[in-house]
Design a protein with these regions (language model features):
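PRPP-associated nucleotide enzymes
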Residues: 1-276
Length: 276
């Protein structure tokens, strides 16, 4: 594709390489480093004048450092006269801070509009109030199977106070669907709830496997047959200590989204058609 360049931040270079390979391209040259005082320095190693630039940086690892690196890369490309800069963020940082809670800020919107929103093309990811329910019913409709819902109430982060199962799972294989799992207390509690309600097996399908703190130990000790995640976050090291984790590559979806954006085609087409 002419007049397009793809750069990778430090967070997930393997995924960036897969995206570039699927587009038949090489990643652009960029050097990222830190000064002795831990400030981030970015040097774009080739001309981006008049180019349609895509920067791949996932919200994982050292999240704040990687976020700052992304914002600096965006600014560097704009200063170098790129015609357009698009941030490709497979796992969106601060996504759990997407609504007003007491006196706290809406951090997901703040960094987007205050940072990458000035200079980078962005689509603000505001989801519906009951996004999880919509997601699971959509999957159930496609597979022509029944669905149940688990309602959870939290008193504080990473701690579920109450969980209620709505639906019948007796003598059925249960598939838990959620957007992300961090310490995995919630999904492990949900798995126990399903088994106690009569499910024969339990699988989990998650978009983002953060797996921090006691997550791996909890999964290993839980009743899951498998925990399936995408590769928005690197999982190689965690898979070595947790054989239940399975990873689905989504580079083809991100590559097609980039191609469609570059060519001015519909990206919403991908909501119902998955490229292979």
């Amino acid at each position: 594709m002419p007049n397009i360049k793809i750069f990778s931040g430090s967070s997930h270079r393997e995924l960036s390489h897969k995206i570039a390979d699927r587009l038949g391209m090489e990643l652009g040259k960029v050097v990222t480093k830190k000064f002795s005082n831990q400030e981030t320095c970015v040097e774009i190693g080739e001309s981006v004048r008049g180019e349609d630039v895509y920067i791949v940086q996932s919200g994982c690892g050292e999240i704040n450092d990687n976020l700052m690196e992304l914002l600096i890369m965006i600014n560097a490309c704009k200063i170098a006269s790129a015609s357009r800069v698009t941030a490709v963020i497979p796992c969106f940082p601060y996504a759990r801070q997407d609504k007003k809670d007491k006196s706290g800020p809406i951090s997901a919107n703040w960094w987007l509009t205050g940072g990458s929103g000035r200079g980078a093309k962005s689509n603000h990811p505001y989801g519906p109030l009951h996004a999880s329910q919509i997601r699971v019913t959509s999957i159930a409709d496609r597979l022509n199977v029944d669905f149940a819902l688990i309602h959870k109430e939290r008193k504080r982060a990473n701690e579920v106070d109450r969980m209620v199962l709505v639906g019948d799972v007796t003598d059925r294989v249960a598939i838990l669907v959620d957007d992300m799992a961090d310490t995995c207390g919630t999904i492990c509690h949900a798995a126990d709830k399903l088994i106690s309600a009569g499910a024969t097996k339990v699988y989990a399908i998650l978009t983002h496997g953060i797996f921090s703190g006691p997550a791996i130990s909890r999964i290993n000790n839980a009743c899951f047959e498998a925990v399936v995640v995408t590769n928005t976050i690197p999982q190689e090291e965690k898979m070595k200590t947790c054989p239940k984790i399975q990873v689905i590559d989504i580079s083809m979806i991100l590559a097609e989204a980039i191609r469609r954006t570059h060519n001015g085609e519909s990206v919403s087409y991908l909501f119902s058609h998955v490229p292979l």
